């Protein structure tokens, strides 16, 4: 914990560093690093600079475990009948043992998620689903408390219980068969800084969990999870440097794969902070075809073929079949494009959804239809735009991006038997997306 410092001092130091960089005096570098404004890598912390810019220059701040925080000096907090203001002072290392005082301080750090709904969904999941070999083992879930194991979730979190562990615990209260899953640890007290740390870690971890489930399809794993951390999670919820294994550790003592992650899909994400909510809705897992269709629709579309003069009925059959295939591919692509922004419909295709389609190679078939709907020139132009836009997500799927370079680029998806979309219909897609019931 650092000593309080005026915002103006840090802003002036940052301005000087920005103009002189490595030539800045050593005391400037030390000051900025001490307060987390300048990272050891030599880059400014976007989180810290954004926080400073939102404060008046006469305010004072300190560095906590969670980053910069406004310092509030309270000489007589009981004036005018007000509640004691929450202060971060040198006494923050002293443990508080009075439960009512802990509650007062805890209430200033609230969760913005529907905890009751999460609890209800977990209860329903536990009643109806068997986890088999992925079930929790004895003592795997650690619950910390201040002498009252029946306390509310926020109090358990304040005591140091991890958020997913706490959710499982409060959802399984009264289930005597599950008591052996929990290792109970009584905490005698907690200091100011740990109250803030425990709750803020839980808040950022649960928000990251929502983003990862909605956009990547699952909770973060431990050391074996090689997926990339979304930029939003790194820059908005953390301070740039975080791994999936770290987020996993903040969520639960037990392996996160054992938590019934599908319950997150049952929660009204509009209760989340607006930025987190928007990010969840923007890129829902299982809906690559929707994003592909929206992107591809701006490139040259095939036209139906016209019969040659004097064509015989026999020679017209292949042409009619080709035209039907062109017509179907365009209809599929155009319908998928209408699903852009329809996050509730898209949620039905999420890998954890009970309503996800059971058609084998479903996304591959839709991708084939989208590619088939474009002319050869349209496909080439689309690939060039993907390269120009540096869209790594699209480039990583060769079925959509193709292989080769320039005019010689090819799309093997068009010849894969498993990508045949003849059994896909727009009416069928409407049923899969639940259009009739939700739009």
Curated annotation (Swiss-Prot):
<keyword id="KW-0167">Capsid protein</keyword>
<keyword id="KW-1035">Host cytoplasm</keyword>
<keyword id="KW-0687">Ribonucleoprotein</keyword>
<keyword id="KW-0946">Virion</keyword>
<keyword id="KW-0694">RNA-binding</keyword>
<dbReference type="GO" id="GO:0030430">
    <property type="term" value="C:host cell cytoplasm"/>
</dbReference>
<comment type="subunit">
    <text>Homomultimerizes to form the nucleocapsid. Binds to viral genomic RNA.</text>
</comment>
<keyword id="KW-0543">Viral nucleoprotein</keyword>
<dbReference type="GO" id="GO:1990904">
    <property type="term" value="C:ribonucleoprotein complex"/>
</dbReference>
<keyword id="KW-1139">Helical capsid protein</keyword>
<dbReference type="GO" id="GO:0019013">
    <property type="term" value="C:viral nucleocapsid"/>
</dbReference>
<comment type="similarity">
    <text>Belongs to the ophiovirus nucleocapsid family.</text>
</comment>
<comment type="function">
    <text>Encapsidates the genome, protecting it from nucleases. The encapsidated genomic RNA is termed the nucleocapsid (NC) and serves as template for viral transcription and replication.</text>
</comment>
<dbReference type="GO" id="GO:0019029">
    <property type="term" value="C:helical viral capsid"/>
</dbReference>
<protein>
    <recommendedName>
        <fullName>Nucleoprotein</fullName>
    </recommendedName>
</protein>
<dbReference type="InterPro" id="IPR021310">
    <property type="entry name" value="Nucleocap_ssRNA"/>
</dbReference>
<dbReference type="GO" id="GO:0003723">
    <property type="term" value="F:RNA binding"/>
</dbReference>
<dbReference type="Pfam" id="PF11128">
    <property type="entry name" value="Nucleocap_ssRNA"/>
</dbReference>
